[in-house]
Amino acid sequence: MGLRINQNTMAVSAHRNLSISDGMLSKSMERLSSGFRINRAADDAAGLAKSETLRADIRGINQAVRNAQDGISFVQTAEGALDEVHAILQRINELAVSAANTATSDGAAEDAEAKELLKQIDSIGTSTKFAGINVFSSASVTFQVGASSADTIAVTTQDLSSAAMSDGATSADLSGIDLTSGASAAMEDVRDAIVIINNLRASLGASQNRLEHTITNLNVTSENLQASESRIRDLDIASEMVSFTRHQIMVQAGTAMLAQANMVPQAVLQLLR
């Protein structure tokens, strides 16, 4: 091989190979520091597109889970209020039974207490709210529980007042009960109201069960999508460490060889002395 001063082809070749190895080492370090196999579109354009689509789906599903949890909180708020109304109706029924026993009572005291309890039912109906929404408004509250616009669950409640107690099929009006003169009739009305409240609670319980099963299914779906996204985007650390070590050795070797190649012109100078 001839010795030349103007063109050091060995140094040029060594520099080119060193640049390649250094670039590979930099990419390997980037992957290891980020934990991702794909950090930009150039790494894997198709893989990045799939990964981003899966990420969007995962975020949507996770939000749907939060929506369903809000639905459960709404149902529990309504259930808690109905539980209190049920207890009040049980007390009014006791008062009606007591007032119906004319041998020991004229019903005045029982009637006074019953009317105060009915006011409390009205208060519960108007004051029970969830996130600013009146819970008992005879309107459906819709919860988005999936990525599709059709993935919704509607929770329906009814107006709740002593004058209009309904489960959607039957109704009861307790506003006119009078335990001084109509205790027996009041007993029937109150029992009808208790049945209505029980039906409402059963309907809410069914809605809560559906929401809970929906959350379970969404969580499973989210886990599966996360696993798929991880397989596409995440880095195999062990495999990458092997590549990193190889590229690191190549950079060290390339640096040494470039230094050796740069010494060749010096050898030519020695011949000229």
Features from the language model and the residues they span:
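Primary detection of the long, small/polar-rich alpha-helical "axial" segments characteristic
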Residues: M1-R273
